[in-house]
Amino acid sequence: MREVISIHVGQAGTQIGNACWELYCLEHGIEPDGRLSPEKTTKPLDDGFSTFFSETGSGKYVPRSIYVDLEPNVIDQVRTGTYRHLFHPEQLITGKEDAANNYARGHYTVGKELIDHVLDRIRRVADNCTGLQGFLVFHSFGGGTGSGFGALLLERLSVDYGKKSKLEFSVYPAPQVSTSVVEPYNSILTTHTTLEHSDCSFMVDNEAIYDICRRNLDIERPGYENLNRLIAQVVSSITASLRFDGSLNVDLNEFQTNLVPYPRIHFPLVTYAPLISAAKAHHEANSVAEITNACFEPNNQMVKCDPRNGKYMATCLLYRGDIVTKDVNCAVSSIRTKRTIQFVDWCPTGFKLGVCYQPPQYVPNGDLAKVNRAVCMLSNTTSIAEAWSRLDHKFDLMYSKRAFVHWYVGEGMEEGEFSEAREDLAALEKDYEEVGQDSIEGEIMEEEY
């Protein structure tokens, strides 16, 4: 089997994890205590979910996941919540003191004490797999545990499991909505550390998802639960073909092969459609062409940036539900003819398709309407560089005054690491700029040198 281990780091990682496992259980017919639901036991078993769940001797299903946070509050809610019997208690790992929004605490001081214990648990879960495919790491860029411990974990995973895929789902600091003052520091330090260790990083930003909840789903004041359930649908779409059968399956390695033209440029933009509330669902057709076009609307993106300002390098369209391949091909060819969507000239084909026959799962009392088909688009576009330059600008404003730096240095970090990280991100912005240039322009520039 091709198993995948999910690792949820910090508060954001844990809460997104809760939403994801709730959804996986509904999709596979697994009760909150880990047993199969009665209607599922009569049907022949689909083998697919053993990629995400392991079966115990007594016929219980246990998620192949590890939750880790440096302070206990958030994971305690999992230990006492609805799904407390689903998870293996030793795979919920908490420390005693939190990282206090400080990358250095998560990475150097507090995180160091916990990392070996966490790796030991991951090793046990990995030993239980017959053909481990890779890891999904969920964390935020802004928090101390998510940025610091998340980076430390990815570094150590590269050492222990060099060839396995490591995909990140990262909550990126939103342009307007901020949860901590030092987000720009944490984000740039963690990106610098993980740039060479992570194979592919799907970014979501809270503000973009707030806007989707308000605009498309008519939720006046979205809470984290609304946001996380939306993210869970996206994660489920990305992992659906690992868990269900379809005519075009996509595994973890295929994402990298098709989406990452150069190792550093591994931050695809995520878009999902249809995003409609139950009230509007009856008036929408949701044809394949409609939902495919909706993916190219900036309003449906999970990160605030405008793809019309950049060029697409590669695009991966993952359909699920009632899909006929012929419709998909028509929709894609009509998009190719549109002049508004620009591809870089060195990547003429640009589309990777995945089709999975399992329709999107409706979550009871959820925000999204029940639909019979959906699509998730992962696109590597040069416009995501906007997100980096926004962040770099905020970093520069604070760092020019050396504001808050003493908190990091006090935890054993060198001040030089700040400037090193900032230079690395400047290089990343430059990489995006160069990739977007036409190949003829590039040749002329090389000749000038």
Curated annotation (Swiss-Prot):
The record marks Y449 as: Involved in polymerization. Mg(2+) binds at E71. Its cofactor is Mg(2+). GTP binds at Q11, E71, S140, G144, T145, T179, N206, N228. GO terms for biological process: microtubule-based process. InterPro entries: Alpha_tubulin (IPR002452), Tub_FtsZ_C (IPR008280), Tubulin (IPR000217), Tubulin/FtsZ-like_C (IPR037103), Tubulin/FtsZ_2-layer-sand-dom (IPR018316), Tubulin/FtsZ_GTPase_sf (IPR036525), Tubulin_C (IPR023123), Tubulin_CS (IPR017975). It catalyses: GTP + H2O = GDP + phosphate + H(+). GO terms for molecular function: GTP binding; hydrolase activity; metal ion binding; structural constituent of cytoskeleton. Keywords: Cytoplasm, Cytoskeleton, GTP-binding, Hydrolase, Magnesium, Metal-binding, Microtubule, Nucleotide-binding. The keyword Aminoacyl-tRNA synthetase does not apply. Transmembrane segments: none annotated. The active site is at E254. Pfam families: Tubulin, Tubulin_C. GO terms for cellular component: cytoplasm; microtubule. The keyword GTP-binding applies. Its EC number is 3.6.5.-. It is found in: Cytoplasm, Cytoskeleton. PANTHER family: TUBULIN (PTHR11588). Dimer of alpha and beta chains. A typical microtubule is a hollow water-filled tube with an outer diameter of 25 nm and an inner diameter of 15 nM. Alpha-beta heterodimers associate head-to-tail to form protofilaments running lengthwise along the microtubule wall with the beta-tubulin subunit facing the microtubule plus end conferring a structural polarity. Microtubules usually have 13 protofilaments but different protofilament numbers can be found in some organisms and specialized cells. Belongs to the tubulin family. Tubulin is the major constituent of microtubules, a cylinder consisting of laterally associated linear protofilaments composed of alpha- and beta-tubulin heterodimers. Microtubules grow by the addition of GTP-tubulin dimers to the microtubule end, where a stabilizing cap forms. Below the cap, tubulin dimers are in GDP-bound state, owing to GTPase activity of alpha-tubulin. This is Tubulin alpha chain. It comes from Pneumocystis carinii. The gene is TUB1.
